[in-house]
């Protein structure tokens, strides 16, 4: 499903398949224009469907300023498949969901390959696995 705003569009429940076949889902806020765009990633166990202003950075704000913003439900939470074990599949257990998601973003036609992350609390901890992908990850905040 896609919803529109004069400055950006939102693609809801976009699937990303992890290395073990588990499907995680994200909302992707896309700026107007042809791209490609730099991207910001936030992964959350608190539901990507919460008010966008509840996120660390406002996805509508960043999307209206030229960034693609990916807000993903972590494994086993809300719209994402799998079993939720805090931090287990984010890079410290057998799977590398943060890495796989950064890789997925980098391969999208709308991505220019420059990716930053956002997050505090649990959302901030799960992005710590992302530095394993230094060639595309530009900023962690």
What are these regions (language model features)?
Residues 16, 72, 119:
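Conserved SAM-binding loop
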Residues 32-107:
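Cap/lid segment of the alpha/beta-hydrolase catalytic domain
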Residues 19, 23, 88-95, 109-117, ...:
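A conserved hydrophobic secondary-structure block that centers on an alpha-helix together
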Residues 24, 37, 136-138:
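Short beta-strand segments enriched for Tyr within beta-sheet-rich domains
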Residues 42, 103-141:
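Primarily recognizes the serine-hydrolase "nucleophile elbow" in alpha/beta-hydrolase
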Residues 11-13, 17, 21, 40, ...:
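Surface-exposed loop/turn and secondary-structure junction residues enriched for glycine/proline
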Residues 1-35:
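N-terminal cap/lid segment of alpha/beta-hydrolase-fold proteins
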């Amino acid at each position: 499903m896609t919803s529109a705003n004069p400055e950006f569009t939102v693609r809801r429940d976009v699937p990303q398949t992890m290395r073990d076949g588990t499907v995680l889902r994200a909302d992707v806020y896309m700026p107007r224009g042809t791209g490609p765009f730099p991207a910001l990633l936030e992964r959350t166990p608190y539901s990507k469907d919460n008010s966008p202003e509840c996120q660390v950075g406002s996805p509508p704000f960043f999307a209206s300023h030229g960034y693609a913003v990916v807000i993903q439900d972590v494994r086993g939470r809300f719209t994402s498949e799998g079993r939720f074990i805090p931090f287990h599949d984010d890079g410290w257990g057998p799977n590398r969901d943060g890495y796989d998601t950064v890789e997925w973003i980098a391969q999208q036609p709308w991505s220019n390959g420059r990716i930053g992350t956002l997050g505090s609390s649990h959302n901030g901890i799960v992005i710590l696995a992302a530095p394993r992908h230094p060639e595309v990850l530009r900023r962690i905040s």
